[in-house]
Amino acid sequence: MKSIVKKMTSLLLLIFVFIGLVGCQKVDDNAAESPSQEASSEENSGADKEASEATLNNKAEFEQLKEGEDFHIGLVTSTVSQGEDEFRGAEAAIEKYGKASEGGIIVNDTYPDRFEAEIETTISKIKAMADDPLMKAIIVNQSVPGTTAAFTEIRKSRPDILLVNLTPQEDILMTSNVSDLVVDADNISRGYRMVLAAKKMGAKKFAHITFPRHMAIETLAIRRAIMEEACKDLDMEFVSLNAPDPTTDIGVPGAQQYLAENIGPWIEKYGKDTAFFTTNDALTEPLLRGVAAGGAIFVEPDLPSPIMGYPSAFSIGLDDIAGDWPAILKIVEEVVIEKGGKDRMGTWAYSLGYTSTIAAVDLVVDVLNGKADITNLDDIKKAFEAQTDGASWAVSNMINMENGEELKNYALVAQDTYVFGKGYLGMTEEEVDEKYRKINVNVEDMVEKQKESEGKFE
């Protein structure tokens, strides 16, 4: 089920690191089509196996901190424009633990907005964290392409550093193999629960808006397949739509303009009782405005949060209450209801990107002090719930589709859906049929299928 494109791209990145060429070798969006990847299937299989074996169970050899021992934690996140919540989560961690340069423990950096075209920069920024002799853990959120290669190199030079991968965008097994902990949104259960939530909110159709690059991300491709299957089971119509990829030359403004111009006609075509969903953060803002104006349905963002798209879509000022999630939710709810979204628009009450960032820091601090286990699901849940008073979380392990076994260091998290004007839907209590956890996809086929969907993707 692994994507050949994703696996080969990750392997090439690992090879560049191993031979010391990361600093000079250009890696671009067309790397998957380079001649070096046209080797025989037998050679590819052998290289694949070798890379997997080289990283399997290659976990941190860290020691518990001594009382009063100085240490640092590295945080690499998206920028405000690509993922504000993760960035704000890093700011919260700095506020709580202090900057390393000012006597605290947090060393913070961001990867480029056009990370697909600047993979080398991402790798170098993550690797640079390990140059700090006091560094004990490195957390990346979101873990964009290049994270696996950087973690692999860090493990070779600094086996004592804990490596935490949040919201990964690379191959599941490779990500698991090079990380001490991986945490991602439970896109398996959410694939079903979001469609069920949409039906509870009155939807008769579910429209999935994305672009081919995102369908090359295994977890997103699986979730899309689950959503389509859930629509069949719940007697709803599944609609596949394209929008431009903001990381391409069209940029964020161009992609947002396209969606803003097309959401109205799509609502007119498919009807107000259609739930619209996009896999991209930057596209969320125009989608929310369009859904509210057209009276359609929006269950929750891809990376759910009351500040994911809502403030910018509806000009909501929240600077004076940043980090106060109950207060943020209250203000956003009032504005959304005023805009016509009562009972038709939702979110998670607390941001996934924000919560996962600060919760991961808290967890790592406890692990380094011998108070928690990095892969213990109860400890992970405790760290998340400590940041989200009143909201329930479901935490489980990712399943390795190749052998049906759980990946013990790969945690999936899900928070209950909050509908404005109605409250929590109780979605974390909804049982998800085991068949959805076993749905397999051919990622290459999914990419081609997306290219054939309605709309422009570049």
Language-model regions, residue ranges each:
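Hydrophobic alpha-helical segments within soluble ligand-binding/sensing domains
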Residues: A54-E61, L181-A207, Y258, I328-V332, ...
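Periplasmic-binding protein-like
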Residues: I73-T77, D132-V144, I161-L166, A207-I209, ...
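Hinge/cleft segment of the Venus flytrap/periplasmic-binding protein
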Residues: A51-N58, I331-E458
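Bacterial lipoprotein signal-peptidase II cleavage site
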Residues: V22-E33
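An alpha-beta-alpha
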Residues: A90, N187-S240, V364
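Flexible loop/hinge segments that line or gate small-molecule binding clefts
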Residues: E153-A185
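Extracytoplasmic "Venus flytrap"
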Residues: E50-I123, I139-P145
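Extracellular/periplasmic periplasmic-binding protein-like sensory domains
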Residues: C231-F238, E285-N369
